[in-house]
Amino acid sequence: QNVICHAPYIINLANRKDEQKWHFSIDFLKGELKRCDLLGIKSLVLHPGSAVGLPKEEALQNIKDGLNEVLKDNFNCLILLETMAGKGTECGTNLEEIKYLVDNTSYPVGVCLDTCHLNDSGIDMSKFDDYLNIFDEKIGLDKIKCIHINDSKNVIGSHKDRHENIGYGTIGFENILNIIYNERLKDVPKILETPYVGETLEDKKRIYPPYLFEIKMIRAKKFDENLFNHIHEYYK
């Protein structure tokens, strides 16, 4: 029941300078939702989009209009708007923008928090409960349907969006544990989106998924200083 899909990045509802491209995004998103419905998948995470030269207010209105055009077809699958880092002209980088989309879309939508994106957008993840309090006041915690769990390679407010392995970034292991085990979010599905581990990313045959070992760390609530060595030993 907790299978969650992610929409392709090619979809951009924010920019409507080219009507043909905007309607392509609408049709593409409809196709994704149809496939999710056929598979019985209940949630689809969506990056809200990038303004690409438009004023942010106009871009947000385009997203809202696009969502309404898509969702009038009454899909069973719920769109989850992902919180973004603020790289380039991304929309959905703060609570005000997410709130606008949630409040003004004529159909129900949810929210997917991304811990790296929150950090890079300027949220102090050591004070995550304060953020949840504000989120609850502005939007409602019931709208949080998924959390992407990542550390970050960059400092708070960098607007860079570069994921890091759990405990090896600027958010830190303890802060991430506090998010994962937060009592108010205990029933929210959490998904690791951390990078593969390898000697060089160019050598695709020598990079390995870290998830087995990161999940072990999370369950044990103990940071593994030799995580990368253990991953290499396991896969070699």
Model-derived regions, located:
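Active-site acidic/histidine proton-transfer and metal-coordination neighborhood
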Residues: 12-110
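Acidic/histidine-rich catalytic cores of soluble enzymes
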Residues: 65-166
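A short, acidic, flexible beta-alpha connecting loop/helix-capping segment that sits on the rim
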Residues: 191-210, 234-235
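Conserved, mostly hydrophobic/aromatic
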Residues: 6, 36, 44, 79, ...
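C-terminal helical cap(s) of enzyme catalytic domains, especially alpha/beta-barrels
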Residues: 201-228
